[in-house]
Amino acid sequence: MFSNGTRANPVIFTSENDVTNAPGDRTDAISEWGGLVILGRAPINRCRDAATPGTVACENIVEGVTNPDALYGGATADDNSGSITYTRVQFAGFAINTQGNELNGITFAGVGSGTNVEFVQVHNNSDDGVEFFGYGGDFGEVVHDGNFVMDGLVFSDGTPSPALHEFKQVVA
């Protein structure tokens, strides 16, 4: 995934209603589209099968997704799943089934240290702003505003990355 805007011209992922200003447009509405899901090959600790965490065989499927090809995880700690800089995701996130699974503004799953994420904003999202399922990179500057239904930043599983400890130090 490559989404590289600039400070003056950020990349904006939004809903069709927001772009077209269609009749009935609910400006600043939430749940108008699913959000971004980035699947990488970095080590995870929750394997779908009886595999050893951190090995190539240790893979999983993002919660609620039924496509068996939508796998993340592996053994590439420096996995490069792209670059997302100066990017805003807005009006995303929604429940995808009745078991409580939902899509977030951005879901990073098995994304490694080779992935660059800087100056990202998730605005008016219906679920978590950003959720991590095994993330080994530096998540940079991430802003979560208008994400009042759930949380802004969530690490679902995996060993906390150094960036999480840095985030904790800033907040504490």
Functional labels for PLM-detected ranges:
Residues 1-172:
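Beta-strand/loop edge motif enriched in small/polar residues
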